[in-house]
């Protein structure tokens, strides 16, 4: 019997793509030698990736140092923007979390940057439903390893992972 629910964030609880694209456009405007325009489809294809893998996918023609510089700058700006403005929660997310939290312990594990889950909480006031969180931006580990950290740290048994990608599906089995 499942007693614990681990959630992915992007694509599962909210869709932040529009706000993220807005922020990235602003940041990239400071780099006149970079003519890349980040589209919603680009962002969608990067959801669930760690920051280094997303950088390689978005900016394959740039050296790794510049990729990471851009990723860090954009991610930092994202956290500020999304914390202040929020983004689109999926339908009935809060009602669902409220109902589930009465019976199950809820957690978020994401491949996002440090601060991203907190900006989600800040904007939407949903932290009250979650027991703990973890992300690759804090640990430097992939989602499967962060699932293990959450499970061990909270002495959990019988978790289920709710996500929207194949990577989410396999991350609990690692």
Q: What spans do the regions from the language model cover?
A:
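Conserved phosphate-coupling serine/threonine residues in phosphotransfer and NTP-handling enzymes
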Residues: 12, 110-112
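N-terminal helical cap/lid subdomain that shapes the substrate entry/recognition surface
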Residues: 2-91
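Substrate-recognition "cap/lid" segment bordering the active-site pocket of phosphatases
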Residues: 114-160, 166-173
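Short, acidic loop-to-helix structural element flanking the phosphoryl-transfer center
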Residues: 80-108, 118, 144
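Short hydrophobic faces within alpha-helices
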Residues: 11, 100, 171-172
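Acidic di-acidic motifs
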Residues: 16, 163-164
């Amino acid at each position: 019997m499942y007693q614990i629910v681990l959630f992915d964030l992007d694509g599962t609880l909210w869709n932040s793509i529009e706000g993220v694209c807005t922020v990235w456009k602003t940041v990239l405007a400071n780099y006149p030698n970079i003519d890349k325009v980040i589209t919603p489809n680009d962002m969608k294809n990067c959801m669930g990736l760690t920051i280094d893998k997303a950088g390689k996918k978005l900016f394959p023609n740039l050296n790794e140092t510049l990729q990471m510089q851009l990723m860090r700058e954009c991610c930092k700006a994202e956290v500020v923007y999304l914390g202040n403005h929020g983004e689109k929660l999926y339908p009935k997310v809060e009602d669902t979390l409220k109902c589930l939290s009465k019976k199950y312990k809820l957690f978020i594990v994401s491949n996002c940057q440090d601060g991203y889950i907190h900006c989600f909480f800040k904007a939407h006031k949903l932290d009250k439903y979650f027991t703990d969180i973890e992300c690759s931006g804090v640990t430097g580990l992939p989602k499967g390893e962060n699932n293990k950290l959450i499970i061990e740290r909270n002495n959990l048994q019988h978790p289920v992972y709710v996500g929207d990608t194949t990577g989410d599906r396999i991350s609990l089995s690692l």
